[in-house]
């Protein structure tokens, strides 16, 4: 039961393009020998055979992850494009979610240490909280007229920046 809960937590944590991009960067650094394998991936320091097997899997997995995340970027832009019909936008989001799940399975296969992903998750949480704050400010028309408050355009700009950064909307991060 505990292991299943842990797996569910990791899956939920990884199932965003923001964290998948971070996981990809970590795997690229291991592949390029900028980060130590045994400090980034859960593997015994003394298990040379397992280390070798992981290094052989990293190259194709990184290539596949890059491809999936590139496609996700295009589908994300389609899904938030209000000029497209809702049917196309929903189809793009559905494809994005399917690819995210494939990417999560690839990252899980590599067994990255949760401690390496936790800082990224905290950044995502802060971005999510800020999106909620910005939406609340935009909804409160009275506060927008007070001196020193950002303009509607500035707030919308910040919200769109955070959405492009995380490939999420405030609603999808709830």
Task: Locate each region found by the language model.
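Transcription initiation cofactors for RNA polymerase, centered on bacterial
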Residues: 1-174
């Amino acid at each position: 039961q505990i292991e299943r809960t842990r797996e569910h937590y990791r899956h939920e944590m990884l199932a965003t393009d923001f964290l998948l991009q971070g996981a990809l960067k970590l795997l690229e650094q291991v592949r390029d020998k900028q980060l130590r394998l045994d400090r980034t991936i859960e593997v015994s320091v003394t298990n040379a055979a397992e280390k070798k097997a992981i290094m052989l899997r990293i190259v194709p997995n990184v290539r596949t992850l890059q491809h999936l995340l590139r496609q996700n970027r295009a589908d994300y832009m389609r899904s938030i494009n209000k000029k497209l019909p809702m049917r196309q936008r929903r189809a793009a989001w559905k494809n994005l979610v399917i690819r995210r799940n494939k990417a999560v399975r690839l990252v899980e296969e590599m067994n990255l240490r949760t401690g390496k992903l936790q800082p990224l998750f905290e950044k995502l949480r802060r971005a999510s909280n800020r999106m909620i704050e910005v939406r609340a400010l935009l909804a409160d028309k009275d506060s927008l007229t007070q001196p020193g408050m950002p303009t509607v355009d500035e707030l919308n700009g910040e919200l769109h920046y955070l959405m492009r950064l995380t490939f999420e909307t405030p609603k999808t991060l709830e």
